[in-house]
């Protein structure tokens, strides 16, 4: 068995008289603990280990578990060498001009009531324009225009839906489905009963057997609408099953085209795992292909031109922010801890994929730092740390006092120092945007997270397999969703007073559902690898324990059903009528849930980031779009 090379440091350690109360004093009880050095601000103590084995033994006989994680894929020198011309002011001026021209297009649509737009398709034109700017990631420039368009469309909404134009008596599925989705996402009250009017006598959505482009587009919009269902909406469940089946069959019969690419994307990345920037990049490519085939109207071409320019201007900002992230990671000393996953670039890709507002740099950087700290703690509690070391660290976090770290092994001292300094620095920055001290909120979330991980470490140490309910309640906290969300949103220029936090933070339903989705989805993707590392407890194994004779397939089916139902509950928490907490205040936390879900869409793209996640980094961060 491989041996960890240890440079002798402190040979004594301390245990706390009580691990449960932050007011108890440290009591020095001499006990040997293996130490591992960490590079921090020029002080380097290196350690080497084999990652090809599940465990390794230190020089003084301490057995440690290892995670089999691949190394960092993105060299700091490479990151620092990135450059883009799109940060020049001339590009910003061009974008400003195009924004004005697109506003004029919106304004021309808003004159429809005066008879300047065709009464047979004006509603569809309004909706298509809104849909285009949102999917292309440029809607932040047109919030006023979007509201005017949607108010106009909603004024013609009926219990049977709408037709393509204000003078069209017969409703149609395409316009109704597109309108339903966009209106619901913007907080308008619409009910799924409208889709009952598109069923035949057999209770099925009426459509021909032919896969015409018009019909496919209608069913595609129906599928997109079905993904924002609320609990108990049976017609939405039926619509999702029908439309997904129809679209999969259509892919087998239609030629490869921009339409087939759009179908593939929507089926692959459903609403709750969709990254807006990836969608923008994909939709740019689709519209660009339509441009080559002369299939775009003048207005859409103008919108596409702006979208490409905006994508590349933000790409320039991404490179600068990524350089800052990489410098922080390098200076933290974390590169010298080779038992952890180094995924700072991947986390930046995720957060810049859900928030493309240039002024939200501190939000994005805070998210990356917090997620990387969570990853370090995850790997320390899950694998490398001994149970005695973890007890010490858990108590030290509860005390939140650097002077109490003298009893920690050296590698933990380094981790604690970076954690303490980074969280405090971010809290000071958050005070500028929130106008009050937010540190206590974050500390409470961090203590809960550490406590949940400590409980899981105790389970691993003792070989205990909990019940599903016991594991799940703890696992929602150890998912890290709450702590990954709370600190970053405080950096936004959105006020989060106490009544808003009550709606989105613990113990709200919103927080519970978001944490549940992440824990359940993570376990379905990670349970086999976790078991190989000696982590027996998962939603799958605990379900099988509670249901003797059940199979892994039974457990996965049950958990996938739980995920689908919980997504509907989270949809409701986001979009339910609530005058006190608008959608805009809940959307950042919701989008973080979507982003984290994206990592686990088909596999653990967080731990194994060398496949789809690597391609995501290239497509949405490293490469500009061709102009």
Curated annotation (Swiss-Prot):
Q: Plastid as a keyword?
A: yes
Q: What induces it?
A: By jasmonic acid (MeJA).
What EC number(s) is this enzyme filed under? 4.2.3.107
Which keywords does this chain's UniProt record carry? Chloroplast, Lyase, Magnesium, Manganese, Metal-binding, Plastid, Transit peptide
Identify the pathway. Answer: Terpene metabolism; oleoresin biosynthesis
GO CC terms: chloroplast
What protein family is recorded? Belongs to the terpene synthase family. Tpsd subfamily.
- Per its record, how is this protein called by name? Carene synthase 3, chloroplastic
């Amino acid at each position: 068995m491989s041996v960890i090379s240890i440079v002798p440091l402190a040979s004594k350690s301390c245990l706390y008289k009580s691990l449960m109360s932050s007011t108890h004093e440290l009591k020095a009880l001499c006990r040997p603990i293996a130490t591992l050095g960490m590079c921090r601000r020029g002080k380097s103590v290196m350690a080497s280990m084999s990652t090809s084995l599940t465990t390794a033994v230190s020089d003084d006989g301490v057995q440690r578990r290892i995670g089999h994680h691949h190394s960092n894929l993105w060299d700091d020198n490479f990151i620092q060498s990135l450059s883009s011309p799109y940060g020049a002011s001339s590009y910003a001026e061009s974008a400003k001009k195009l924004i004005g021209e697109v506003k004029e297009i919106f304004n021309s649509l808003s004159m429809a009531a005066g008879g300047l737009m065709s009464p047979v398709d004006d509603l569809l034109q309004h909706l298509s324009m809104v849909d285009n700017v949102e999917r292309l990631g440029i809607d932040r420039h047109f919030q006023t225009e979007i509201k005017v368009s949607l108010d106009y469309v909603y004024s013609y909404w009926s219990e049977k839906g709408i037709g393509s134009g204000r003078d069209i008596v017969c409703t149609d599925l395409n316009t109704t489905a597109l309108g339903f989705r966009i209106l619901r996402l913007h907080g308008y009250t619409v009910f799924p009963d409208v889709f009952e009017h598109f069923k035949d006598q057999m209770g099925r959505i009426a459509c021909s057997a032919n896969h015409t482009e018009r019909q496919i587009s209608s069913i595609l919009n129906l599928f997109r609408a079905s993904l924002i269902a609320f609990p108990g909406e049976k017609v939405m469940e039926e619509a999702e099953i029908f439309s997904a089946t129809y679209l999969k069959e259509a892919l087998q019969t239609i030629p490869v085209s921009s339409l087939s690419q759009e179908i593939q994307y929507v089926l692959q990345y459903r609403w709750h795992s969709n990254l807006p920037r990836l969608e923008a990049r994909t939709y740019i490519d689709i519209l660009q292909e339509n441009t080559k085939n002369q299939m775009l109207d003048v207005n859409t071409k103008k919108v596409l031109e702006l979208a490409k320019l905006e994508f590349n201007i933000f790409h320039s900002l991404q490179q600068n922010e990524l350089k800052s992230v990489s410098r922080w990671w390098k200076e933290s000393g974390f590169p010298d801890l080779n038992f952890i996953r180094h995924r700072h670039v991947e986390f930046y890709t995720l957060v810049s994929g859900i928030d493309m507002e240039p002024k939200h740099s501190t939000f994005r950087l805070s998210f990356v730092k917090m997620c990387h700290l969570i990853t370090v703690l995850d790997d320390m509690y899950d694998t490398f740390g001994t149970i005695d070391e973890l007890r010490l660290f858990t108590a030290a976090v509860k005390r939140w006092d650097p002077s109490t770290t003298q009893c920690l092994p050296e590698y933990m001292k380094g981790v604690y120092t970076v954690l303490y300094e980074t969280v405090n620095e971010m809290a000071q920055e958050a005070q500028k945007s929130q106008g009050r001290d937010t540190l206590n909120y974050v500390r409470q979330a961090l203590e809960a997270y550490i406590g949940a991980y400590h409980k899981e470490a105790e389970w691993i140490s003792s070989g205990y397999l909990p019940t599903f309910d016991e594991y799940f309640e703890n696992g929602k906290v150890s998912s890290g969703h709450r702590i990954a969300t709370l600190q970053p949103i405080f950096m936004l220029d959105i006020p989060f007073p106490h009544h808003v936090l009550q709606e989105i933070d613990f113990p709200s339903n919103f927080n519970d559902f978001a944490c549940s989705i992440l824990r359940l989805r993570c376990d379905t993707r990670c349970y086999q690898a976790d078991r190989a590392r000696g982590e027996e407890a998962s939603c799958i194994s605990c379900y099988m324990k509670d249901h003797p004779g059940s199979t892994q397939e039974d457990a996965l089916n049950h958990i996938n059903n739980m995920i689908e139902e919980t997504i509907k509950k989270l949809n409701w928490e986001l979009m339910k009528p609530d005058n006190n907490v608008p959608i805009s205040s809940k959307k950042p936390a919701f989008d973080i849930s979507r982003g984290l879900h994206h990592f686990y869409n088909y596999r653990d793209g967080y731990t194994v980031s060398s496949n789809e996640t690597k391609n995501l980094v290239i497509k949405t961060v490293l490469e500009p779009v061709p102009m």
